[in-house]
Amino acid sequence: MLKFQNYTYDEPSTCHSFEINNIDLAIINGIRRVILTDIPIPGIIGEKLDNDDPSVDIVINNGALHNEIIIHRIGLIPICLKEDEIDDYEDNSILIELNVKNTTNKTIDVRTNHITATRNFVNISEDELKDIFPANKISKDYILITRLRTGEHLHFKAKIVKRTGRDNASFNPVSLSNFSYIQDPKEADKKQNILDKERSYYKNKYGDPVRFKFDIESINHNIGPKYLVSKSLDIIINKLEALKKELNSERSTKVKIQQFQDIEGTFEFIIEDEDDTLGNIIQSYIHSNYIRENNKFKDKISCTYIGYICPHPLKSLMIIRISLENVSDPTSSKIFASFLEENCSIIIEELSKIKNEWTNFAIENI
């Protein structure tokens, strides 16, 4: 069975759906999480972040909404660049400006079609602006920024920067990224209870789900699952490559290896700047291959425990704990680092194969 199949697109909701088969649940959840938090996209900083101030300068505003609300609303405006433009984008290369004064005798709407912009100090054409700030397909309206009464004036300038949803939700490329288990109708027919029917999904011999429906609603009309899924797999691969590099470094500042509570044959890896996404993928792969399937490392070494923990939800810190048996020196960290590094390499190979299958599927179907 193909890993990806049955792509559909619902235009009113902009929802892309497709089925995923026989891919580890942790990898699918990792793709979902990375799409939501780790894909860099251009946008406007509409509120103070940890390392950034708002990228909006209010020149004149004597309307009903005060500056903080206007800046926040501007920060939520999607910047719809194309895939190659997103990848190559450098901070502040696009500058936008809006200057509207109500000289009529009635209240007017100020919308994104009033915005002008420059790219590298060259004016962006009106047609391109309509693509960057598109109207709603159903209502044909542009995004409402504010309303001005007679004599009121709004003038602002803003810089477009590239950040991720981890920095702020306004840099989230999607409004929806989730998955569900596909029900097995033969098993569901055997159940009388509605909840039992919902639990009757396709499973492997361990009871894990193996068929999924993945849904993505993209905010930017120029990018969709073809770009987002590929990008998320690249990011996960890069995270694993970076971890491998740190494991090989004797002077690593991001990975600390130490024996866990003086328990012989158990070491923990304290990893900075990582979270559940990577931890769950590594844990799931090692558990499936060494504990469930009882495979050996270097033909004789058994893994008896693999687990991870992120001690605090607001701190990017992950701890992986591994127990190995039949090691020549259970107090040496080298064999544990080698074990984790080799498994990272195997996961990278698997993710690369998945990406190739996804690319072929996307070319033919999306």
Predicted regions and their residues:
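Protein-protein interaction/assembly regions in multi-subunit complexes
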Residues: 1-366
